[in-house]
């Protein structure tokens, strides 16, 4: 059995060596297990690429990939998956929050017959805002891209090679790993692992980054938002028709009561706002089609160590 560990790296020059050593120590507990570590520098502004090159020079089981610009975590994972040669591929973070020491929990669960197994955290070390964002993301993923309700997804997961082979066939620049997994298989499992505090620094995701990730996932792999827009349009039309009938009835029955400009203005603002929102949603889909037709790259490799 050969394991491939794929780690996107960003602002982790002081932590990635610790994570790599933890992987080495963990694999050593299962004699006969071969492994490789694929480290993808997502154009980090710190010196992590120099650290990766040093690690790769000292150990031929470590592969380093440097992207030409910051393409994002999911594109960095796709770059790593393209170079993974193991039977099982494990994804984890570069900051020590995901417990590499519990990798064989994922392996053992996968060998029960699953295609993909996610580690989940009974007690998360994330702050309240990130936990709320994770909960919102889960509910939206269940409603829009078909995530099973009983499944908990995290950035610590393992996949069989054939799943990775299917994922890397995705050519467009809007990679969203969970969406690619859910459309490839429904044979998914969970196993509980420990969630630790990061070794150093803070999350690279801002509020804007998280919102962008959600939009990317839900517009790249589902047309349900467009169908929802259709129903919202129908609902607004029915509300407008009903309001019109009510105004006519009120004028006929109570002609002395003046027509309310406040209610009319509120209605116009509501309908106008909904129209702009739905036009923005449609524009997002059209823009993605345009970018895909222009063959924008999913990632560009500047340098590699192998």
Task: For each feature predicted by the language model, list its residue ranges.
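Solvent-exposed polar/charged
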Residues: 57, 82, 108, 112, ...
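Structured catalytic core of nucleotide-sugar glycosyltransferases
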Residues: 1-126
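Protein kinase-like catalytic domain
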Residues: 24-27, 168, 294
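Hydrophobic helical membrane-anchoring modules
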Residues: 176-306
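Acceptor/aglycone-binding surface of glycosyltransferases and processive sugar-polymer synthases
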Residues: 63-69, 73-83, 88, 97-175, ...
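Short conserved micro-motifs on helix faces and helix-strand junctions that flank
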Residues: 8, 67-69, 92, 157, ...
